Structures are given as C-alpha cells and as structure tokens.
Amino acid sequence: MSEKENNFPPLPKFIPVKPCFYQNFSDEIPVEHQVLVKRIYRLWMFYCATLGVNLIACLAWWIGGGSGTNFGLAFVWLLLFTPCSYVCWFRPVYKAFRADSSFNFMAFFFIFGAQFVLTVIQAIGFSGWGACGWLSAIGFFQYSPGAAVVMLLPAIMFSVSAAMMAIAIMKVHRIYRGAGGSFQKAQTEWNTGTWRNPPSREAQYNNFSGNSLPEYPTVPSYPGSGQWP
C-alpha cells in the first residue's frame, strides 16, 4: 500500500512548505469515534480563534491605558499555542483513536490537562498574563468602558473553551478506560517504540490475520463428460 500524502495544514501552493501531517477522519478514525475526534478538532480551532480575539482585546486594553506587556504576551501565545496545541494534544488524541494507542492516550491526558488548567487561568484573567479574562475585563470598566466591553469577549470564549475541554477529557477518559487502556500498555508501547508512529487498526488487523486465504479461490477442475467412469 502506497504511503499517504500529507494534507495538513492545507497550505497554498505558492508557499514553499509542504503539509506536515496526514489527516482524514473518515479514512483513519473508527466510525464510532469520528464525531468525538471531530469535535476535539473543532475545539482546537475554537481555542485558536479565542487566542486571536484575545490579541485584539489586549490591543484595546493597551489603547485604553493598560500595559503593553499584555499585548506582547498575547501575540506570543497566539504564535506559540496555535501550532503547539495541535501537535501536543490534538495529534496524540487523533493517533490514539486511530491506532488504539495507550501511550498517545496518556500523552493527551497529561498535556490536555495542563492546557485545561492554563485555559482556566486565562479565563480568570490575571493581570500581566497576556489574557483578557474576567478579572481584567471587569476591573477595567472604571478606566475605559469601551475597551472593557471588547475584553469581555475573550473572557467568555476562554470560559467556553475551558468548559468544552473539561467535557472532552472526561469523554475520552471514559472511552479509554472502557476499552481496557492502562499505564502498562503505554509502557509497552514506549519500550517497543510503536508510540512514534502507531499503525492504524486496519494495519494491525492485517498483520494479525495475514493472508490466510488466496485473494481469489481456486476453481475446481472437473473432467469432461466422456471421462467420467
């Protein structure tokens, strides 16, 4: 079987950089898990959009009299977390469901859990963190009501992101435990090296079953009517 060509991210042809990953939900993810994995993918997209809105809100915060440090950090968060969140927690959960990989499930739980905690902190909105959360937005109404209204939007979006992350991690954990996943399986994948590029479920089945039967069964050959005894 020929190697699948990478298709994500879908970059324009004039950019001299090729896609880094192959992503196809209907082709690689089991039917019963496709809806959940697609929702986690949309959650990643929503979080990236939240970081973009947060950058605009931090600019309004700065124009309204706030610190420019928040705008600078918001820019760093957008550039850093957009690709890193995809690589560090969406790809692990994608590969986990694609290949039933305990190691990738464990990686997802650990990194996505840290992402959840960070998103909660961003929703709270401590000053100097580069995030327009509830504390920073509400506290800025006395200085610039217009800027504070803009700052409320990322606060709401960060809160929605955190709630969706909590739901996602609970659903994934329930499926993981129900399928018999364990830390011992993750250790086995680590020791054997299969965690780097775990084979799909279809490939695992083919390796296990092998070619037990020929592709086309042999048609029996019978003697002509004159040759029968």
From Swiss-Prot:
Its main location: membrane. It is found in: Membrane. One of its GO terms (cellular component) is trans-Golgi network membrane. Coiled coil: none annotated. The keyword Cytoplasm does not apply. It is a multi-pass membrane protein. Keywords: Membrane, Phosphoprotein, Protein transport, Transmembrane, Transmembrane helix, Transport. The modification Phosphothreonine is found at T194. Signal peptide: none annotated. InterPro entries: SCAMP. It holds the Pfam family SCAMP. The chain crosses the membrane at residues 40-60, 61-81, 105-125, 149-169. The keyword Protein transport applies. Residues 208-229 are annotated as: Disordered. Probably involved in membrane protein trafficking. Belongs to the SCAMP family. This is Secretory carrier-associated membrane protein 4. The lineage of its organism: Eukaryota, Metazoa, Chordata, Craniata, Vertebrata. The gene is SCAMP4.
